[in-house]
Amino acid sequence: ITCLPYRRQRLVLFAALSHPLAQKSQLSLKQLEGQEFVLREQGSTTRRVFEHALKQADVRIRVSLEMGSREAVREAVAQGLGLGIVADTAYVADPRLRAIGLTGPELYTHAHIICLKERKNARLLAHFLSLADTMKDPG
């Protein structure tokens, strides 16, 4: 298997417009102390990265719901059931929601392109990998 780094995805906090924190443009992790969250299921990369950062900052949140998809998290947050967190590439603008920047530690997940090593040079796949290389994050 070949694994090629593709993109860093910054985590984004989001809230229903009716949530008191929705009026903020930026928050620190410390400001999330005691807040209710709707999170993805245990094992989710986004959740793992977020919970690790919370632990490092000694911040405790309350998990009101665990959902199996980003879409379910978005709908629960829109209904006012808690705050949500997703990768910026997965955040879908919604008039019921407000994205809020997080200050402090860099909270990222990483996307990779994975393929079978023996197929890496197949014409179609090689073309795709070349195109993806022009679109990946620098560095």
Where are these regions (language model features)?
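Secondary-structure junction motif
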Residues: 21-22, 36-57, 121-129, 138-139
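Short secondary-structure boundary segments
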Residues: 17, 87-90, 111
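Short beta-strand-to-loop elements that line the ligand-binding cleft
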Residues: 59-69
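Generic preference for hydrophobic
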Residues: 3, 13-14, 37, 85, ...
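Short beta-strand-centered segments that line the small-molecule binding cleft or hinge
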Residues: 1-15, 73, 78-81, 97-100
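A late-sequence structural motif
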Residues: 22, 100-139
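A ligand-binding cleft/hinge motif common to bilobed small-molecule-binding domains
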Residues: 49-52, 56, 70-98
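Flexible hinge/capping segments at coil-to-helix
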Residues: 1-37
